[in-house]
Amino acid sequence: MSVSCGIDWAEDHHDVGLVDADGRIVGKHRISDDVAGFALLLQLLTDAGDSAEDPIPVAIETSRGLLVACLRATGRPVYSINPKAVDRYRDRHSVARKKSDAGDALVLAHILRTDRAAHRPLPADSELAQAIAVLARAQQDAVWERTCAHNKLRSLLREYYPAILAAFADKRGGILRPEARAVLAAASTPAAAAKLTTAQLRKLLTAAGRQRGIAPEAQRLQTVLRGEYLRHPPLVEDALGAQALALLRQLNTASTNADELAAEAVAHFDKHPDAEIITSLPGLGSLTGARVLAEIGDDRSRFADARSLKAYAGAAPVTRASGKSRTVMHRRVKNQRLAGVGYVWAFAALTASPGARAHYDRRRTTGDRHTAAQRNLFNRLLGLSLIHI
Protein backbone atom coordinates (compact mmCIF):
# COMPACT_ATOMS: atom_id res chain seq x y z
CA MET A 1 0.00 0.00 0.00
CA SER A 2 1.42 3.39 -1.06
CA VAL A 3 0.77 6.07 1.56
CA SER A 4 1.49 9.80 1.45
CA CYS A 5 1.69 12.15 4.42
CA GLY A 6 0.91 15.86 4.62
CA ILE A 7 1.70 18.14 7.56
CA ASP A 8 0.16 21.57 8.11
CA TRP A 9 2.65 23.17 10.48
CA ALA A 10 2.21 25.89 13.10
CA GLU A 11 4.19 27.27 16.02
CA ASP A 12 2.90 25.05 18.83
CA HIS A 13 1.16 22.19 17.00
CA HIS A 14 1.00 20.44 13.63
CA ASP A 15 -1.86 18.69 11.83
CA VAL A 16 -0.99 15.39 10.15
CA GLY A 17 -2.95 13.71 7.37
CA LEU A 18 -2.26 10.37 5.65
CA VAL A 19 -3.92 9.04 2.49
CA ASP A 20 -3.43 5.85 0.49
CA ALA A 21 -2.98 5.46 -3.27
CA ASP A 22 -6.76 5.51 -3.83
CA GLY A 23 -7.23 8.74 -1.88
CA ARG A 24 -8.76 7.11 1.19
CA ILE A 25 -7.85 8.72 4.52
CA VAL A 26 -5.53 6.43 6.47
CA GLY A 27 -5.17 8.70 9.48
CA LYS A 28 -5.53 12.23 10.85
CA HIS A 29 -4.04 13.63 14.03
CA ARG A 30 -2.86 16.84 15.67
CA ILE A 31 0.58 16.60 17.27
CA SER A 32 2.43 18.96 19.58
CA ASP A 33 5.61 20.76 18.58
CA ASP A 34 7.93 18.87 20.91
CA VAL A 35 9.70 15.53 21.35
CA ALA A 36 6.48 13.76 22.33
CA GLY A 37 4.71 15.12 19.27
CA PHE A 38 7.47 13.96 16.93
CA ALA A 39 7.45 10.52 18.53
CA LEU A 40 3.70 10.35 17.93
CA LEU A 41 4.25 11.35 14.29
CA LEU A 42 6.74 8.53 13.81
CA GLN A 43 4.27 6.12 15.39
CA LEU A 44 1.51 7.29 13.03
CA LEU A 45 3.81 6.73 10.07
CA THR A 46 4.80 3.28 11.33
CA ASP A 47 1.16 2.29 11.81
CA ALA A 48 0.52 3.37 8.21
CA GLY A 49 3.22 1.02 6.89
CA ASP A 50 6.36 3.15 7.11
CA SER A 51 9.67 1.27 7.01
CA ALA A 52 13.35 1.97 6.42
CA GLU A 53 13.15 0.22 3.05
CA ASP A 54 9.99 2.06 1.95
CA PRO A 55 9.64 5.31 3.93
CA ILE A 56 6.45 7.33 3.63
CA PRO A 57 7.09 10.68 1.89
CA VAL A 58 6.04 13.85 3.69
CA ALA A 59 4.81 17.15 2.23
CA ILE A 60 5.00 20.37 4.25
CA GLU A 61 4.85 24.08 3.42
CA THR A 62 8.33 24.95 4.68
CA SER A 63 11.90 23.80 4.24
CA ARG A 64 13.11 25.05 7.62
CA GLY A 65 12.60 24.39 11.31
CA LEU A 66 13.17 21.57 13.77
CA LEU A 67 10.32 19.42 12.47
CA VAL A 68 11.74 19.42 8.94
CA ALA A 69 15.27 18.80 10.23
CA CYS A 70 14.13 15.80 12.27
CA LEU A 71 12.11 14.40 9.36
CA ARG A 72 15.11 14.69 7.05
CA ALA A 73 17.26 12.94 9.65
CA THR A 74 15.02 9.87 9.36
CA GLY A 75 16.06 9.49 5.72
CA ARG A 76 12.58 9.89 4.23
CA PRO A 77 11.76 12.13 1.25
CA VAL A 78 10.51 15.51 2.46
CA TYR A 79 8.80 17.81 -0.04
CA SER A 80 8.57 21.54 0.59
CA ILE A 81 5.45 22.73 -1.25
CA ASN A 82 4.92 26.40 -2.03
CA PRO A 83 1.92 27.72 -0.02
CA LYS A 84 0.54 29.39 -3.15
CA ALA A 85 0.54 26.03 -4.92
CA VAL A 86 -1.23 24.44 -1.94
CA ASP A 87 -3.90 27.15 -2.10
CA ARG A 88 -4.56 26.30 -5.75
CA TYR A 89 -4.60 22.56 -5.09
CA ARG A 90 -7.19 23.16 -2.37
CA ASP A 91 -9.74 24.19 -5.02
CA ARG A 92 -9.52 20.72 -6.57
CA HIS A 93 -11.17 19.25 -3.49
CA SER A 94 -13.75 21.94 -2.74
CA VAL A 95 -15.12 24.91 -4.70
CA ALA A 96 -16.63 26.38 -1.52
CA ARG A 97 -13.23 27.87 -0.53
CA LYS A 98 -13.47 26.31 2.90
CA LYS A 99 -10.23 25.89 4.82
CA SER A 100 -8.98 24.14 7.94
CA ASP A 101 -5.61 23.04 9.27
CA ALA A 102 -6.59 19.36 9.17
CA GLY A 103 -7.94 19.83 5.65
CA ASP A 104 -4.71 21.47 4.50
CA ALA A 105 -2.74 18.50 5.82
CA LEU A 106 -4.86 16.20 3.65
CA VAL A 107 -4.43 18.52 0.64
CA LEU A 108 -0.66 18.24 1.07
CA ALA A 109 -0.91 14.45 1.26
CA HIS A 110 -3.02 14.37 -1.92
CA ILE A 111 -0.43 16.52 -3.72
CA LEU A 112 2.13 13.77 -3.22
CA ARG A 113 -0.41 11.08 -4.11
CA THR A 114 -1.32 12.61 -7.48
CA ASP A 115 1.57 14.89 -8.50
CA ARG A 116 4.63 13.68 -6.66
CA ALA A 117 6.67 13.58 -9.87
CA ALA A 118 6.03 17.30 -10.41
CA HIS A 119 7.73 18.25 -7.15
CA ARG A 120 11.28 17.79 -5.93
CA PRO A 121 12.21 16.53 -2.47
CA LEU A 122 14.55 18.53 -0.28
CA PRO A 123 18.16 17.69 -1.19
CA ALA A 124 20.12 15.22 0.91
CA ASP A 125 22.96 17.66 1.57
CA SER A 126 25.73 16.82 4.00
CA GLU A 127 25.76 18.35 7.48
CA LEU A 128 28.70 20.57 6.51
CA ALA A 129 26.88 21.85 3.42
CA GLN A 130 23.83 22.67 5.52
CA ALA A 131 26.02 24.57 8.00
CA ILE A 132 27.61 26.52 5.13
CA ALA A 133 24.13 27.40 3.87
CA VAL A 134 23.14 28.79 7.26
CA LEU A 135 26.30 30.89 7.57
CA ALA A 136 26.40 32.12 3.96
CA ARG A 137 22.76 33.19 4.02
CA ALA A 138 23.16 34.86 7.42
CA GLN A 139 26.20 36.74 6.11
CA GLN A 140 24.25 37.90 3.07
CA ASP A 141 21.43 39.07 5.35
CA ALA A 142 23.97 40.99 7.45
CA VAL A 143 25.32 42.66 4.30
CA TRP A 144 21.80 43.73 3.35
CA GLU A 145 21.24 45.08 6.87
CA ARG A 146 24.53 46.96 6.66
CA THR A 147 23.50 48.49 3.35
CA CYS A 148 20.14 49.49 4.79
CA ALA A 149 21.76 51.09 7.86
CA HIS A 150 24.30 52.87 5.67
CA ASN A 151 21.61 54.30 3.40
CA LYS A 152 19.58 55.54 6.37
CA LEU A 153 22.61 57.16 7.98
CA ARG A 154 23.77 58.81 4.77
CA SER A 155 20.27 60.14 4.10
CA LEU A 156 20.15 61.65 7.60
CA LEU A 157 23.61 63.20 7.29
CA ARG A 158 22.58 64.89 4.06
CA GLU A 159 19.84 66.66 6.02
CA TYR A 160 22.07 68.34 8.60
CA TYR A 161 25.77 67.37 8.30
CA PRO A 162 27.07 67.81 4.72
CA ALA A 163 30.61 68.41 6.01
CA ILE A 164 31.13 64.78 7.06
CA LEU A 165 29.91 63.56 3.66
CA ALA A 166 32.14 66.03 1.85
CA ALA A 167 35.13 64.97 3.94
CA PHE A 168 34.90 61.39 2.68
CA ALA A 169 33.20 61.91 -0.68
CA ASP A 170 36.33 60.99 -2.63
CA LYS A 171 37.14 57.98 -0.46
CA ARG A 172 36.08 54.48 -1.45
CA GLY A 173 33.24 53.41 0.82
CA GLY A 174 32.44 56.93 1.94
CA ILE A 175 30.82 56.99 5.35
CA LEU A 176 31.30 53.21 5.58
CA ARG A 177 35.05 53.69 6.04
CA PRO A 178 36.30 53.03 9.60
CA GLU A 179 37.88 56.49 9.88
CA ALA A 180 34.63 58.15 8.76
CA ARG A 181 32.67 56.29 11.40
CA ALA A 182 35.30 57.14 14.01
CA VAL A 183 35.06 60.86 13.24
CA LEU A 184 31.25 60.73 13.27
CA ALA A 185 31.23 58.94 16.62
CA ALA A 186 33.51 61.61 18.10
CA ALA A 187 31.63 64.53 16.54
CA SER A 188 28.03 63.81 15.63
CA THR A 189 27.20 67.44 14.82
CA PRO A 190 28.83 70.11 12.64
CA ALA A 191 29.47 72.23 15.73
CA ALA A 192 31.39 69.42 17.42
CA ALA A 193 33.30 68.63 14.22
CA ALA A 194 34.46 72.23 13.85
CA LYS A 195 36.07 72.03 17.29
CA LEU A 196 38.20 68.95 16.52
CA THR A 197 41.93 69.65 16.57
CA THR A 198 44.43 68.03 14.25
CA ALA A 199 45.83 66.10 17.21
CA GLN A 200 42.39 64.67 17.97
CA LEU A 201 41.86 63.81 14.31
CA ARG A 202 45.24 62.08 14.12
CA LYS A 203 44.29 60.01 17.16
CA LEU A 204 40.94 59.08 15.60
CA LEU A 205 42.55 58.08 12.31
CA THR A 206 45.13 55.94 14.09
CA ALA A 207 42.47 54.23 16.22
CA ALA A 208 40.47 53.50 13.06
CA GLY A 209 43.43 51.61 11.57
CA ARG A 210 44.98 54.17 9.23
CA GLN A 211 48.76 53.75 9.01
CA ARG A 212 49.99 56.16 6.33
CA GLY A 213 49.59 59.87 5.66
CA ILE A 214 47.91 60.46 8.99
CA ALA A 215 49.12 64.05 9.52
CA PRO A 216 48.13 65.43 6.08
CA GLU A 217 44.83 63.57 6.22
CA ALA A 218 44.06 65.07 9.63
CA GLN A 219 44.83 68.54 8.29
CA ARG A 220 42.60 67.96 5.26
CA LEU A 221 39.72 66.73 7.40
CA GLN A 222 39.98 69.73 9.71
CA THR A 223 39.84 72.10 6.75
CA VAL A 224 36.75 70.42 5.32
CA LEU A 225 34.94 70.09 8.65
CA ARG A 226 35.49 73.77 9.45
CA GLY A 227 34.17 74.95 6.10
CA GLU A 228 31.04 77.05 5.59
CA TYR A 229 27.80 75.03 5.36
CA LEU A 230 24.12 75.63 5.97
CA ARG A 231 23.15 74.76 9.54
CA HIS A 232 20.10 73.85 11.62
CA PRO A 233 19.33 75.62 14.91
CA PRO A 234 21.58 74.25 17.73
CA LEU A 235 18.87 72.24 19.54
CA VAL A 236 17.65 70.66 16.31
CA GLU A 237 21.22 69.92 15.29
CA ASP A 238 21.89 68.17 18.60
CA ALA A 239 18.72 66.08 18.20
CA LEU A 240 19.75 65.05 14.71
CA GLY A 241 23.20 64.18 16.06
CA ALA A 242 21.64 61.86 18.63
CA GLN A 243 19.66 60.16 15.88
CA ALA A 244 22.81 59.81 13.78
CA LEU A 245 24.64 58.13 16.66
CA ALA A 246 21.79 55.63 17.01
CA LEU A 247 22.01 54.81 13.30
CA LEU A 248 25.80 54.65 13.54
CA ARG A 249 25.53 52.00 16.25
CA GLN A 250 23.25 49.97 13.96
CA LEU A 251 25.74 50.34 11.12
CA ASN A 252 28.68 49.29 13.30
CA THR A 253 26.79 46.24 14.56
CA ALA A 254 25.76 45.21 11.05
CA SER A 255 29.32 45.68 9.77
CA THR A 256 30.75 43.57 12.58
CA ASN A 257 28.14 40.86 12.01
CA ALA A 258 28.86 40.78 8.27
CA ASP A 259 32.61 40.48 8.84
CA GLU A 260 32.35 37.80 11.54
CA LEU A 261 29.82 35.71 9.61
CA ALA A 262 31.97 35.99 6.47
CA ALA A 263 34.94 34.59 8.39
CA GLU A 264 32.80 31.72 9.74
CA ALA A 265 31.34 30.93 6.32
CA VAL A 266 34.78 30.88 4.70
CA ALA A 267 36.23 28.72 7.49
CA HIS A 268 33.47 26.12 7.04
CA PHE A 269 33.64 26.33 3.25
CA ASP A 270 37.39 25.66 3.21
CA LYS A 271 36.71 22.35 5.02
CA HIS A 272 34.32 21.12 2.34
CA PRO A 273 35.64 18.59 -0.22
CA ASP A 274 34.18 20.65 -3.09
CA ALA A 275 35.84 23.91 -2.00
CA GLU A 276 38.96 23.43 -4.12
CA ILE A 277 36.91 22.60 -7.21
CA ILE A 278 34.54 25.53 -6.75
CA THR A 279 37.28 28.10 -6.20
CA SER A 280 39.10 26.80 -9.29
CA LEU A 281 36.26 28.19 -11.41
CA PRO A 282 37.04 31.67 -12.82
CA GLY A 283 35.71 34.51 -10.69
CA LEU A 284 34.89 32.51 -7.56
CA GLY A 285 36.62 33.15 -4.24
CA SER A 286 35.99 31.56 -0.87
CA LEU A 287 33.05 33.78 0.15
CA THR A 288 31.28 33.77 -3.20
CA GLY A 289 32.07 30.06 -3.48
CA ALA A 290 30.42 29.50 -0.10
CA ARG A 291 27.31 31.32 -1.33
CA VAL A 292 27.19 29.19 -4.47
CA LEU A 293 27.64 25.95 -2.52
CA ALA A 294 25.01 27.09 0.00
CA GLU A 295 22.37 27.27 -2.72
CA ILE A 296 23.47 24.38 -4.95
CA GLY A 297 24.38 21.99 -2.12
CA ASP A 298 26.43 18.82 -2.44
CA ASP A 299 23.65 16.34 -3.25
CA ARG A 300 24.76 15.08 -6.67
CA SER A 301 21.26 13.82 -7.51
CA ARG A 302 19.57 17.17 -6.89
CA PHE A 303 19.78 18.43 -10.48
CA ALA A 304 19.10 16.03 -13.34
CA ASP A 305 21.12 18.11 -15.80
CA ALA A 306 22.70 21.51 -16.31
CA ARG A 307 19.46 22.99 -17.65
CA SER A 308 17.59 22.32 -14.42
CA LEU A 309 20.37 24.00 -12.44
CA LYS A 310 20.31 27.01 -14.76
CA ALA A 311 16.54 27.29 -14.41
CA TYR A 312 16.82 27.07 -10.62
CA ALA A 313 19.37 29.91 -10.64
CA GLY A 314 17.35 32.08 -13.01
CA ALA A 315 20.08 32.01 -15.67
CA ALA A 316 17.94 30.18 -18.25
CA PRO A 317 15.22 32.22 -20.00
CA VAL A 318 11.51 31.40 -20.02
CA THR A 319 9.54 30.90 -23.24
CA ARG A 320 5.85 31.84 -23.40
CA ALA A 321 4.21 30.53 -26.57
CA SER A 322 0.53 30.64 -27.48
CA GLY A 323 -0.73 30.39 -31.04
CA LYS A 324 1.42 32.61 -33.25
CA SER A 325 2.84 34.50 -30.27
CA ARG A 326 6.20 33.47 -28.87
CA THR A 327 8.13 35.47 -26.26
CA VAL A 328 11.44 34.66 -24.59
CA MET A 329 11.96 36.55 -21.35
CA HIS A 330 14.05 36.75 -18.20
CA ARG A 331 13.10 34.14 -15.59
CA ARG A 332 11.50 35.79 -12.53
CA VAL A 333 10.79 32.74 -10.38
CA LYS A 334 14.19 31.54 -9.20
CA ASN A 335 16.53 31.17 -6.26
CA GLN A 336 17.08 34.86 -5.59
CA ARG A 337 20.25 34.33 -3.55
CA LEU A 338 21.92 32.21 -6.22
CA ALA A 339 20.83 34.64 -8.92
CA GLY A 340 22.29 37.51 -6.89
CA VAL A 341 25.69 35.91 -6.44
CA GLY A 342 25.59 35.01 -10.12
CA TYR A 343 26.04 38.65 -11.14
CA VAL A 344 29.01 38.99 -8.77
CA TRP A 345 30.51 35.76 -10.11
CA ALA A 346 30.06 36.75 -13.76
CA PHE A 347 31.48 40.23 -13.18
CA ALA A 348 34.58 38.86 -11.44
CA ALA A 349 35.06 36.26 -14.19
CA LEU A 350 35.46 39.04 -16.76
CA THR A 351 38.92 39.87 -15.41
CA ALA A 352 39.81 36.35 -14.24
CA SER A 353 39.14 34.52 -17.52
CA PRO A 354 39.89 35.63 -21.11
CA GLY A 355 37.28 33.15 -22.30
CA ALA A 356 34.62 34.66 -20.06
CA ARG A 357 35.54 38.12 -21.30
CA ALA A 358 35.33 37.01 -24.91
CA HIS A 359 31.91 35.44 -24.36
CA TYR A 360 30.63 38.59 -22.66
CA ASP A 361 31.94 40.77 -25.50
CA ARG A 362 30.26 38.53 -28.09
CA ARG A 363 26.93 38.86 -26.31
CA ARG A 364 27.30 42.63 -26.15
CA THR A 365 28.10 42.71 -29.86
CA THR A 366 24.90 40.81 -30.66
CA GLY A 367 22.85 43.46 -28.84
CA ASP A 368 22.59 42.22 -25.24
CA ARG A 369 22.57 44.82 -22.51
CA HIS A 370 25.12 44.55 -19.72
CA THR A 371 22.90 42.59 -17.32
CA ALA A 372 21.65 40.26 -20.07
CA ALA A 373 25.22 39.53 -21.16
CA GLN A 374 26.21 38.88 -17.55
CA ARG A 375 23.25 36.56 -17.08
CA ASN A 376 24.20 34.63 -20.22
CA LEU A 377 27.77 34.33 -18.94
CA PHE A 378 26.42 33.12 -15.58
CA ASN A 379 24.44 30.52 -17.52
CA ARG A 380 27.66 29.22 -19.10
CA LEU A 381 29.54 29.25 -15.81
CA LEU A 382 26.82 27.21 -14.11
CA GLY A 383 27.07 24.54 -16.79
CA LEU A 384 30.82 24.49 -16.30
CA SER A 385 30.45 24.13 -12.53
CA LEU A 386 28.07 21.16 -12.83
CA ILE A 387 30.51 19.38 -15.13
CA HIS A 388 33.39 19.77 -12.68
CA ILE A 389 31.43 19.08 -9.50
Regions found by a protein language model. Give the residues of each.
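A detector of single, family-specific signature residues
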Residues: 1-387
